[in-house]
Swiss-Prot record:
Record's bilayer topology term: Peripheral membrane protein
Superkingdom as given in the UniProt entry: Eukaryota
Extent of motif NPF 2: 458-460
SMART domains per the UniProt record, alphabetical: VHS
Source organism per UniProt: Dictyostelium discoideum
Subunit annotation: Interacts (via GAT domain) with ubiquitin. Interacts with eps15 and chcA. Interacts with tsg101 (via UEV domain).
Keyword Signal appears in the UniProt entry: no
Protein name stated in the entry: Target of Myb protein 1
Protein keywords: Cytoplasm, Membrane, Protein transport, Repeat, Transport
Sequence repeat intervals: 386-388, 458-460, 528-530
Any one GO molecular-function label of the UniProt entry: phosphatidylinositol binding
Span(s) of short sequence motif NPF 1: 386-388
Length: 663
C-alpha cells in the first residue's frame, strides 16, 4: 500500500508535488517504521526514471528525511548515495535535475556533519565538493536543517514557504535518541582529549566515501568509449585515494588508535588497494585497445593452459611407453621400486591411475577394419533341434558341385524371373498321386468287406480287374491335371472307377488322349437346379421306382453295353448341383443331422431294394474325367415335401467310402 502511494506521488503526469500524498506517507512511516526500507528502495528506483519523475522523487525524499527520522539510516546507505553521485556526474543529466541534486546533497551534508552513526551524508557532500562541483546558491527562504546536536538539545529552524511550499518542521517530542560517538571521550586509547576523536572519525568517513565513489566510477567505465586518463573526475579520485592511502598508513603505524578503529582502518586500506589495482587494469585495457587499431581486443591465449596440455600429452606418451614395456617384460618401474624400497603393488596402482582409459586409440586397429568389412551376420538358432534324435545322413551332399555348375549359367545371362522348362513330373504331383493311390486302395478294401456277403452276381462288387495295381506293386499315378504330362508313347493308367457308371473302354497303349469337355449350355435343364424335369445324369428315386416296376425284366435282358465315348472322358466342367431338398426332408432315414444317411447305409439299402437300378439311370450319363469323378445321386425314397427339386448328393465323392480326396 505504501509503495502505491510512492508511485502516486512520483507520477510523471503531476504538474507539481502532491503534498497530500507526501504527508500521508509520512504519517504511515511514523506509525509503522517497518515500511521505511521499502519506501526508500522505491524512491531509489524512481531516480533511474525520466527527469520529471526524478525531480518528484527528490522532493519526496527531502520531505521524508525531515519528517520521518526512521528513514535516516536507509537514506544514508551506499545505494541511495551512489545514485545521487551518478546524477551529478552523468553528462546526460539535465541541468535542473543536477542543480536539485546538488542542493539536496549540500543541505544533507551540513545537517549530518557531526553524525557518525550515519556518515553517508557527509561523505557524499565532501566528495562532491572535492570533485570541483559548484553548489547552487541557496534561496533566502530555504530551511536550515541541523541534526548534529543531541536529541535533547536538537532544534530545527524552519520557515514557512509561501509559494507552493509546506511546513516540514517535525515535532521535537517525536525525535528518536541517537548515541553520539564524539561524546564518549573515555574510549581513547592514547588518553588524548575529546577533540581528537571526532577528527579521526570524520577523516575515516570521508576516505570511505571517496573510495566507494572511485570504485563505482571504475566499474561503470567503458574502456572502448572513454580513456580513464582523460577523465578529470577519475583523475581527481585517483589522487585522492593515493593521499588517503598514505594517511591511513600513518594512522595505523602511529599506534594511538584503539582496537575498534584499527580494524576499520585495515579494511579501508584493503579497499583503497583494490580500487587502485582496478584503475591500473582499466588503463592497460585501454592501451591494448588503442594498439589494436581501436578494435575490440580478443581474449589472450592462456599460456598456462597450453603448458598443461603439453604436460598431459607428454605424460600420456610416457604412460604408453611404460605400458608397452610392461607387456614385453622390460619394466622400468622395478628399479625405482628397489631404490625406493616401496612395494610393487603401489607402483601398479599409480600406473593405473595415470592411464587414461577414455582416450581414443592412436591408430586404426586391423580388427576394427576387418569387422567393418565383414557383413553383419545374424546368429541363427535351430528351434527344431532334438538332442535325443539319431543323426541322419545328409541327402544332398553334392550341392557345392551344383552351385559351381549354376554359376556359369548366371554369368551368361541366366534370369531367375523367366519361367524355366520344368521336368516331366514334379515332386508335388508325384506326392499327390501316391497319396491318392493309397487312399483308393484302402477304400477298395473297405468296399470288398461290405460287398462280400452279396455273392458273385452282385453288380456292385469290386472286381480284381478294376484295380489299378499290377502284379501287386503300387505304381505312382500321374493325373491328367499335372503341370507336365508324360509323353504319348508312355502307357496311360486306367482311370478311376465309378461304381455307379458302366466300365469305360480301356485304351492302354493307344495314342488317343482325352478331348476337351463339351461346351456349357446355360439354358438347358442340365444347368438349371430349380427345374422340375430331372437331368440326364440325375434321376430321382421316384422315377427309378416307376421304371423298375414297369420293366423289371427288360433291364436285365436288354441292357446295352455303353461304349466309351472320349468326348465325355475328360469332362471336368460338367455341372453337378447339390440337393437342397434333401437337407432335413428325409423323415424315414433321418440319422444324419444334415438330412442324409451315411454312405454305407445308403449302399446297403440300394443293394437290397434296387440292385439293377444303376444301369437304367446312368444309361445316358456321361463319364467324368480320370482325376475328378463325382458320385451319383443317392437312392432314397421320394419324401420331398418341397417339390420341384431333384434329390442328389450334396457332396461329391470319388468312391464308395465317402472320403473326399480332392485337392
Amino acid at each position: 500500500m505504501v509503495t502505491e502511494l510512492v508511485d502516486k506521488a512520483t507520477n510523471e503526469l503531476l504538474i507539481q508535488t502532491d503534498w497530500t500524498t507526501v504527508l500521508q506517507i509520512s504519517d504511515i512511516l511514523n506509525r509503522d517504521p517497518i515500511h521505511a526500507r521499502g519506501v526508500v528502495r522505491q524512491v531509489t528506483k524512481k531516480l533511474k526514471d525520466r527527469s520529471r519523475v526524478i525531480l518528484l522523487a527528490l522532493e519526496l525524499a527531502d520531505s521524508l528525511l525531515q519528517n520521518c527520522h526512521c528513514t535516516h539510516v536507509y537514506f544514508a546507505e551506499r545505494t541511495f548515495q551512489t545514485e545521487l553521485c551518478r546524477l551529478i556526474m552523468n553528462k546526460k543529466t539535465k541541468l535542473n535535475v543536477k542543480e536539485k541534486t546538488l542542493e539536496i546533497v549540500e543541505s544533507w551534508g551540513n545537517a549530518f556533519q557531526a553524525r557518525h552513526d550515519v556518515p553517508g551524508f557527509y561523505e557524499t557532500y565532501s566528495f562532491i565538493k572535492r570533485s570541483g562541483y559548484k553548489f547552487p546558491p541557496k534561496p533566502s527562504d530555504a530551511p536550515i536543517l541541523n541534526f548534529n546536536n543531541s536529541p535533547a538539545k536538537r532544534t530545527v529552524s524552519t520557515t514557512i514557504l509561501t509559494n507552493n511550499s509546506h511546513s516540514t518542521t517535525p515535532p521535537q517530542a517525536n525525535v528518536p535518541s541517537f548515541n553520539n560517538v564524539s561524546s564518549v571521550g573515555s574510549n581513547n586509547a592514547g588518553g588524548g582529549g575529546s577533540s581528537s576523536q571526532p577528527i579521526k572519525n570524520q577523516e575515516i568517513s570521508s576516505i570511505k566515501g571517496s573510495t566507494s565513489v572511485f570504485n563505482e566510477m571504475i566499474s561503470f567505465l567503458n574502456v572502448e568509449d572513454e580513456d580513464p586518463q582523460e577523465n578529470d573526475l577519475i583523475k581527481e579520485l585517483f589522487e585522492t585515494c593515493k593521499q588517503s592511502q598514505i594517511r591511513v598508513k600513518e594512522m595505523i603505524e602511529s599506534g594511538s588508535t584503539n582496537e575498534r578503529d584499527l580494524n576499520v582502518l585495515l579494511k579501508l586500506n584493503d579497499e583503497i588497494n583494490n580500487a587502485l589495482n582496478d584503475h591500473e587494469a582499466c588503463i592497460k585495457r585501454r592501451r591494448a585497445f588503442v594498439e589494436n587499431g581501436y578494435k575490440p581486443v580478443p581474449p589472450p591465449q592462456q599460456q598456462q593452459q597450453q603448458q598443461q596440455q603439453q604436460q598431459q600429452q607428454q605424460q600420456q606418451q610416457q604412460q604408453q611407453q611404460s605400458h608397452s614395456n610392461n607387456h614385453n617384460g622390460t619394466t622400468t618401474t622395478t628399479t625405482t621400486n628397489n631404490n625406493n624400497k616401496n612395494p610393487s603393488y603401489l607402483t601398479k596402482h599409480k600406473e593405473l591411475e595415470e592411464i587414461d582409459f577414455f582416450k581414443a586409440p592412436d591408430g586404426i586397429s586391423p580388427y576394427s577394419v576387418q569387422q567393418q568389412l565383414q557383413p553383419f551376420q545374424q546368429q541363427q538358432f535351430n528351434s527344431t533341434y532334438n538332442p535325443f534324435a539319431q543323426p541322419q545322413p545328409q541327402q544332398f551332399q553334392q550341392q557345392p558341385q551344383q552351385q559351381l555348375q549354376q554359376q556359369p549359367q548366371q554369368q551368361q545371362g541366366f534370369n531367375q524371373r523367366i519361367q524355366q522348362p520344368q521336368q516331366q513330373a514334379d515332386a508335388f504331383d508325384l506326392f499327390v498321386a501316391n497319396r491318392q493311390q493309397s487312399n483308393n486302395n484302402n477304400n477298395n478294401n473297405n468296399i470288398n468287406n461290405t460287398t462280400s456277403s452279396f455273392g458273385a452276381n452282385n453288380p456292385f462288387a469290386n472286381n480284381s480287374s478294376n484295380n489299378n495295381n499290377t502284379n501287386g506293386a503300387i505304381q505312382p499315378y500321374i493325373p491328367n491335371t499335372a503341370k507336365s504330362l508324360p509323353p504319348v508313347s508312355q502307357q496311360l493308367q486306367q482311370p478311376m472307377q465309378n461304381q455307379f457308371s458302366p466300365q469305360p473302354q480301356k485304351f492302354v497303349g493307344s495314342s488317343i488322349t482325352p478331348s476337351a469337355p463339351p461346351p456349357f449350355k446355360p439354358n438347358t435343364t442340365q444347368s438349371n437346379p430349380f427345374n422340375t424335369s430331372p437331368p440326364l445324369n440325375n434321376m430321382n428315386n421316384h422315377n427309378n421306382n416307376m421304371m423298375q416296376q414297369q420293366q423289371p425284366q427288360q433291364q436285365q435282358q436288354q441292357q446295352p453295353q455303353q461304349q466309351f465315348n472320349p468326348m465325355y472322358n475328360n469332362n471336368a466342367m460338367a455341372p453337378s448341383y447339390p440337393n437342397y431338398n434333401a437337407i432335413g426332408a428325409d423323415n424315414q432315414h433321418n440319422t444324419n443331422p444334415y438330412g442324409m444317411m451315411n454312405h454305407q447305409q445308403q449302399q446297403q439299402q440300394q443293394q437290397q431294394q434296387q440292385p439293377m437300378m444303376n444301369q437304367m439311370n446312368n444309361f445316358s450319363a456321361p463319364t467324368y474325367s480320370q482325376f475328378t469323378n463325382y458320385a451319383q445321386p443317392n437312392q432314397q425314397p421320394y419324401n420331398n415335401n418341397y417339390g420341384g427339386m431333384n434329390q442328389s448328393n450334396m457332396y461329391p465323392n470319388n468312391n464308395m467310402s465317402g472320403k473326399s480326396s480332392l485337392i
